[in-house]
Amino acid sequence: MKKAKLIFKDNTPFSLDFDDFYFNFKDGLNESKFVYTHSFEWKNQENFIIAESGFGIGLNFFLTLKRFLETTPSKRPKKLFYISVEAFYIEKEQLREIYQKLEFYEEFKELLEQFLKFYPKAKEGIYRFYFEDCFLDLVFEDIAVLKELDFKADVWYLDGFSPNKNSQMFDENLIFEVARLSKKNTQICTFSSASFLQKNLKKYGFRVEKTKGFRKREMIKAYLENELEFKDKEAYFSRTFSSLKNKKVAIIGAGISSAVLAYELSLRGFEIDIFEKHLELGKGASGNESGILSSLILKPKVNLGEFSELSFIEASRFYRQILDLEFKGVVEFAHNDLMQERFDTQRENVLFKISKNQAFLEEGGVIFPKKLVKNLFEKSKACIYFNHEFQAYKFENGCFSLKFKNDVVKSDYAVLIYAMGADAKDFVFYDEMKLSKVRGQVTHLKPFLDTPFPLSSKAYICPVKDDLQVIGASYDRLNASLESKEEDDKQNIENIADFMDKNTKLEIIGSKVGFRSYSSDRFMIVGNAYDEAFYKEEYKALLWTKNKEQKPAKMSCNLYFNFAHGSRGFSTSVLAARYLCALINNEPLCLEKKYIHAIHPARFLIRKLKKGL
């Protein structure tokens, strides 16, 4: 992404890109309060959403968060969601320097340093920060990204530079998206009173009021009179807003996808019950002694590769923010010509430090799955029921009752989530959803290689832990055996031969078998279970009508899917959990539409219907 060209002028940050100050150089702090952060009233509701065009140095955000935290909880929303779009990246050290020069640093020190600790690299994406009762989604993209987002703001901060120097931030296209992402009575806050901005706001249903500005003649406020109606050509992927009888959630499965989800749900006040068929944690694919957190490296502009990168960096940031983990990096090796070609196209990617056939991923590293999963469940305060093998459910009067193999019945759940990994194949039976169960075996060796970070080529090698070194993993679609195979251990060892001296003698001290869940297109399957009969009837003519407005999708009930994470569940589970929480709790969706469409459970059927099949 573009980096901001910034200097100090009159002791105030000045943009060389727009030939304008970032804010009022005489009294920026009080102007931000007057125009934006103190110009509206909090509502005592579940979620309050503020959206901003132009994050800049983050002053509006920190002022808003400070006001939110200083307000008595009974007089403010339970959760604050703050979504801010920024196209020009400011370096971490430069941000700190700005606050110090402006003498704002001490006032915001604690919040600012928490923010800077997890500040991402200069790469497009949506990055979430966790503050007390507040989620900040920092969107590093051009403002046109709004057409890819889905939320309904309570308040908009239309910031940015002067309209005559940055007209895109106030033009008709932008105001249409602002209106689309607003609800009745949404308030617009802006320093500008430009006539063309007023005209655009009125065109899309805002009531515009002129009011006294900060140390100037006037500014405007605007309020949306009625929610905008617009045509949706892809309504089959649209969200359905949930209505819940209670806040009880049942999750089937106790692996990493379940653990991250349980933690995220707990932040929203849900009561979570986990049902696991085994007698303890760590018996499935999420129970390895060691593993790696890394990313696929594909060519630029490949959706799967870009999603893998975003999943990876957000997982790394999540584990650092929530579990205080530290990562030392991971080295990926190009072991064939195709991989080398991919590496060569990614030399400008800030996530990958590529040298010849090696890529160093600084945000990656070794993970300890059993410990990580256990810690997340403990933080979530979820109740885990072991030896509960799920069989079926009934959905009546807005609640689920669950039947288990041991004849136990659990009931009164408003939400049911399948997070059972490879076992999903035995419970989900859509015609076009092809799931596969892939066996993987890791090998436990006596320590043989001293490395501070994982190495990944045909197979991976983890650093030594507790006098044990893990390598892996095999890949077998045809074998469903739970027993370790000697030939798999041999294959794992052959696949790491490039890392060893020919005379190295390896001692196998154990192995572990797990099963991965895959979809046919390698994207995870995450979202609401859909009504297959409705889809087949309503969208049967998509071959001819795909460019016309579509009827909104119909889902079957509050049943959600969270599986097909493949071998990278420790990366993808974080975005999956956030997205599911947004669907369940009616929050801003934290993914761009292109990714929502890519992971949607109905995508396979829609592709077929578009072909007229």
Curated annotation (Swiss-Prot):
This is tRNA 5-methylaminomethyl-2-thiouridine biosynthesis bifunctional protein MnmC. It comes from the Bacteria. GO terms for molecular function: oxidoreductase activity, acting on the CH-NH group of donors; tRNA (5-methylaminomethyl-2-thiouridylate)(34)-methyltransferase activity. The keyword S-adenosyl-L-methionine applies. PANTHER family: SARCOSINE DEHYDROGENASE-RELATED (PTHR13847), TRNA 5-METHYLAMINOMETHYL-2-THIOURIDINE BIOSYNTHESIS BIFUNCTIONAL PROTEIN MNMC (PTHR13847:SF283). One of its GO terms (cellular component) is cytoplasm. Pfam families: DAO, Methyltransf_30. It catalyses: 5-aminomethyl-2-thiouridine(34) in tRNA + S-adenosyl-L-methionine = 5-methylaminomethyl-2-thiouridine(34) in tRNA + S-adenosyl-L-homocysteine + H(+). Its cofactor is FAD.
